[in-house]
Amino acid sequence: MKILFLNGPNLNLLGQRQPDIYGTTTLAEIESAVREQAEGRAEIEFRQSNDEGELVTWIQDAVSEVMVLNAAGYTHTSVALRDAITASDVPVVEIHLSNIHAREEFRHNSLIAPVCKGQ
């Protein structure tokens, strides 16, 4: 099985940005832990971008069996990501590092959740 993990804006700052919300674990440490768990069972690829257009292109070009997407701030604003997910034949699972429903009200709504296989 091939799994593509896509990480959106500011996730490159994990470990230093708002540790009270996101913790002190870096994105590289998360990637390492996932690779270790998947070893011998799945081929894992990670990508991170602060650019919405680049994320859209990666979704459009995905050659994997499943995508795991942390769209970060784009979760609540990006019609472009929603449309790219809708157009893709690859199932997408939306993930977050914090509970978006327990945060500021503007974070409660996900534009991408309705077109993902799970949240």
Language-model segments: what does each one mean?
Residues 1-4:
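Extreme N-terminal starter segment of soluble prokaryotic enzymes
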Residues 33-65, 82-93:
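Nucleotide and nucleotide-moiety/phosphate-recognizing core
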Residues 66-103:
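Mid-chain, well-packed structural core segment of small domains
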Residues 45-46, 93, 101-119:
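Short, glycine-/small-residue-rich phosphate/pyrophosphate-handling segment
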Residues 12-21:
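A short acidic, helix-capping loop that chelates divalent metal ions and anchors anionic groups
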Residues 20-38:
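Short catalytic helix/loop segments, enriched in acidic residues and glycine
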Residues 17-18, 59, 80-82, 105-107:
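Short amphipathic alpha-helical segments
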